[in-house]
A protein has these predicted regions:
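Short, solvent-exposed recognition patches
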Residues: 1-56, 134-202
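N-terminal "mature-domain start" segment
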Residues: 1-6, 103-150, 243
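Residue-level marker of positions within ordered structural domains that often coincide
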Residues: 33, 81, 129, 136, ...
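A short, solvent-exposed beta-edge/loop patch
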Residues: 49-110, 198-243
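Extracellular/luminal segments of secreted precursors and ectodomains of membrane proteins
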Residues: 114-119, 160, 171, 209
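N-proximal accessory regions
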Residues: 121-125, 194, 206-208
């Protein structure tokens, strides 16, 4: 049932709840998140197109659905308990959403799409062929989908519903934030550098694999887990020689 919002209530907000653990809130007039990229999965429901973003905070049970083809944009946040057996929290909003303008909003570029190339992509073929089809919960996209996203040659991407993608580029220029003595993380025999200068307001981080004949950059959500970095490290170890 619809409930009151404590004052001062923000403009364009509404809320529904059945108990303390099952609630849904709506905001109209929000900005679309940076997680909305050319690699995003979207869902059509209630006459609109929606982006689902799962809260990756450990222990959190929230997800937010953003309307990406309406103005003003709408965000609906729900607990998973409130969803129950429903696929989404927006199916009943069709009549209300029809009052908003339909617009075409360009998504943000895919992660790493704008990184500078080092011109060493020709050394990456064996690695790209050997990369796994799955990394934890993430499934690799085919080459046509990667190209359609705007990523350049020698790129790979894996996606999972509601999460930011994992993106790999081979043959990029050295990490902008790297300097001798920087802290590195060793995974198997691959030293990785996390470049925090490339943080863009999302939950993803950018990592560079060092000491190979072509430099590798990987963007991945912080919640992706060890399966992603271990799987990629194994492929690099076997299929990309040391510098």
């Amino acid at each position: 049932r619809r409930t009151d919002i404590a004052e001062p209530a923000p403009a364009g907000a509404a809320a529904w709840s059945s108990n303390s653990t099952e609630s849904i809130t709506l905001r109209c007039g929000v900005s679309l998140p940076l997680q909305y990229t050319t690699l995003s999965h979207t869902t059509d429901a209630a006459g609109s197109t929606w982006l689902r973003v799962v809260d990756a905070t450990p222990g959190a049970n929230l997800e937010t659905w953003y309307s990406v083809n309406r103005h003003p944009a709408v965000a609906v946040t729900t607990t998973r308990a409130a969803l129950g057996s429903h696929a989404n929290p927006v199916d009943d909003l069709g009549e209300s959403m029809s009052d908003l303008s339909t617009v075409a909003v360009n998504p943000h570029p895919a992660p790493l799409a704008t990184l500078e190339s080092a011109g060493t992509e020709d050394r990456c073929d064996a690695l790209l062929s050997a990369l796994p089809n799955t990394l934890g919960d993430f499934t690799r996209l085919d080459a046509a989908s990667v190209t359609a996203s705007g990523l350049p040659a020698a790129s790979a991407a894996w996606t999972a519903e509601g999460q930011e993608p994992v993106v790999l580029r081979c043959g990029v220029a050295p990490a902008p934030g790297y300097a001798p003595g920087a802290q590195l993380q060793q995974v198997n025999d691959i030293p990785w550098f996390e470049d925090t200068t490339l943080a863009n307001g999302t939950t993803s981080s950018t990592w560079f694999a060092l000491d190979r004949e072509a430099e590798i950059a990987v963007s991945m959500p912080q919640s992706a887990g060890n399966a992603v970095i271990v799987g990629i490290s194994s492929a690099i170890s076997e299929h990309l020689p040391r510098a």
